Amino acid sequence: MQSKWTPYPWVCFSMCVGVMGTALASPLYPIYQQAWGLQPSHITQIFVAYMFGALASLLFLGRLTDRFGFLAVLRAGLVLMTLGITSSALAWNVPSFAICRFVIGVASGLITTSASVGMTQLNNKGDLQRAAATTSLTIAFGFGLGPVVGGLMAQWLPMPLKTAYLPSILLGFLAIYALFQVRIPASTSTSTGGLSFRDVMPALSQPRRPFLRHYML
């Protein structure tokens, strides 16, 4: 039986929600600074925690998409992202918030890599330029939407350090539910065997030439 949930738009939606979650906290730092008495060094630590999580995810978890398929990794990334954002709303000091940002960084790497692969594989026309353009636009839209939503929620609602995260949490649950409803063609599923040590070893490789060319436009 064919699923009514078309995979391609929901993969795009999931990437947008994931990227939105990474940028949501940007307009909240002045409020954190007033509430917690943050120093510039504290903000640096929070940014470093996020970047360390994102880089670690890209270096050590990038192969998981090849092993388990993009859909499984995208689901895991969104669950982790939603968990990190929910925890951010409950954070009470700099160390707890930095841990949340680290988790969000790891989830960001999983989401962007798996969703990019998914949009390429689900593109029926095999148009790499279209897939690359869609990926770029989705990422840009998510990065722009996050601060706008977070800023508006913080401006007009009480308890801004909690309520600002609600849209991202709700959209995250919607994306997770949708990804568990979609069905992808068997040819796009690459889940074979279990996890090995080699799957989490850093690997640097050059993208396929057409993909590289289109991303450099």
Predicted regions and their residues:
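Helix-loop-helix hairpin linking two adjacent transmembrane segments in secondary transporters
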Residues: 125-183
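Juxtamembrane helix-start elements in MFS-like secondary transporters
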Residues: 7, 39-47, 132, 136
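Cytoplasmic helix-loop-helix junction between adjacent transmembrane helices
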Residues: 100-139
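Extracytoplasmic
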Residues: 6-40, 112
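Helix-breaking motifs and short loop linkers at transmembrane-helix boundaries and internal kinks
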Residues: 37, 69, 90-96, 158
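Central cavity-lining transmembrane alpha-helices of secondary-active solute carriers
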Residues: 45-63, 112, 116
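Flexible cytoplasmic inter-helical loops of multi-pass small-molecule transporters
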Residues: 183-203
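Paired small-residue
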Residues: 84-87, 95-104
